[in-house]
From Swiss-Prot:
Protein's name according to its UniProt entry: AP-1 complex-associated regulatory protein
Chain's role: Necessary for adaptor protein complex 1 (AP-1)-dependent transport between the trans-Golgi network and endosomes. Regulates the membrane association of AP1G1/gamma1-adaptin, one of the subunits of the AP-1 adaptor complex. The direct interaction with AP1G1/gamma1-adaptin attenuates the release of the AP-1 complex from membranes. Regulates endosomal membrane traffic via association with AP-1 and KIF5B thus linking kinesin-based plus-end-directed microtubular transport to AP-1-dependent membrane traffic. May act as effector of AP-1 in calcium-induced endo-lysosome secretion.
Family matches, as PANTHER family: AP-1 COMPLEX-ASSOCIATED REGULATORY PROTEIN
Main location: Golgi
Species in which this protein is naturally found: Homo sapiens (Human)
Subcellular location field: Golgi apparatus, trans-Golgi network; Late endosome; Early endosome
GO BP term, example: substrate adhesion-dependent cell spreading
Region Interaction with AP1G1, annotated ranges: 78-138
Length: 302
């Protein structure tokens, strides 16, 4: 009979086997549980240290209140379940309020970000418009107002091209004025010696100068003489030296020994009617005429 009472009593308490029960007095927390060893049922108590409860982070069990202990003793399990449901609803309501608050804060943050981006974009557009207006009406470095018209753009382009051309042209003139070939240098020496030895005035010189549009005088480099022309000049000079009885000149002084006719500057026309080459001495014709006269004198001597 006693075993049956114990079995019924502990069968009801088996459902609440994991629940905690605080026993008054003593100072320590005590737990009780039931276990069956064969047919005999015994109660075992475990005395736990309070510090162990704080050190166990995984334990989420809350201690039983006095009302719950009374309800357990009186077997009012429905009231315990109702109280737990009310507590769960209260917790869920608080969580819902917190979630709604977080959602509103996030929406306000997103709205503020969108508004800031819209304001930044508007400021950027206003700044670009202001810069465009300033560039359109602000005076440039040349003191002229810039305009977006096609004619003004074309004129400014022409001015830029002209300035670049002037710089390039001045650099080319300065470089070409100092470039002289060896034949040109010897020709310049020849003209200098001819001026000093001849009795003609400065108007009879062979200074070929070209006056460009900027008013600068630049000497045109002379064409380099070929080998045939040098041979003809050398033969003409040798014959003239033999005729006058002077000492023969060396091959290096042939170009410097060239003499000009006294009637170099003349207004006579040549056979073709061109006065451009009038006054120049043709060494080929001179050589042929002198050769014919020399052969005639030899025949008369014989």
């Amino acid at each position: 009979m006693g075993n049956c009472c114990w079995t019924q009593c502990f069968g009801l308490l088996r459902k609440e086997a994991g629940r905690l029960q605080r026993v008054g007095g003593g100072g320590g927390s005590k737990y009780f549980r039931t276990c069956s060893r064969g047919e005999h049922l015994t109660i075992e108590f475990e005395n736990l240290v309070e510090s162990d409860e704080g050190e166990s982070p995984g334990s989420s069990h809350r201690p039983l209140t006095e009302e719950e202990i009374v309800d357990l003793r009186e077997r009012h399990y429905d009231s315990i379940a109702e109280k737990q449901k009310d507590l769960d609803k209260k917790i869920q309501k608080e969580l819902a309020l917190q979630e709604e608050k977080l959602r509103l804060e996030e929406e306000a943050l997103y709205a503020a970000q969108r508004e800031a981006a819209r304001a930044a974009k508007q400021r950027k557009l206003l700044e670009q418009e202001r810069q465009r207006i300033v560039q359109q009406y602000h005076p440039s470095n040349n003191g002229e107002y810039q305009s977006s018209g096609p004619e003004d753009d074309f004129e400014s382009c022409l001015r830029n091209m002209k300035s670049q051309y002037e710089v390039f042209r001045s650099s080319r003139l300065s470089s070409d004025a100092t470039v002289l070939t060896p034949n040109t240098e010897s020709s310049c020496d020849l003209m200098t010696k001819t001026k000093s030895t001849s009795g003609n005035d400065d108007s009879t010189s062979l200074d070929l100068e070209w006056e460009d549009e900027e008013g600068m005088n630049r000497m045109l480099p002379m064409r380099e003489r070929s080998k045939t022309e040098e041979d003809i000049l050398r033969a003409a000079l040798k014959y003239s030296n033999k005729k006058t009885g002077s000492n023969p000149t060396s091959a290096s002084d042939d170009s410097n020994g060239l003499e000009w006719e006294n009637d170099f500057v003349s207004a006579e026309m040549d056979d073709n009617g061109n006065s451009e080459y009038s006054g120049f001495v043709n060494p080929v014709l001179e050589l042929s005429d002198s050769g014919i006269r020399h052969s005639d004198t030899d025949q008369q001597t014989r």
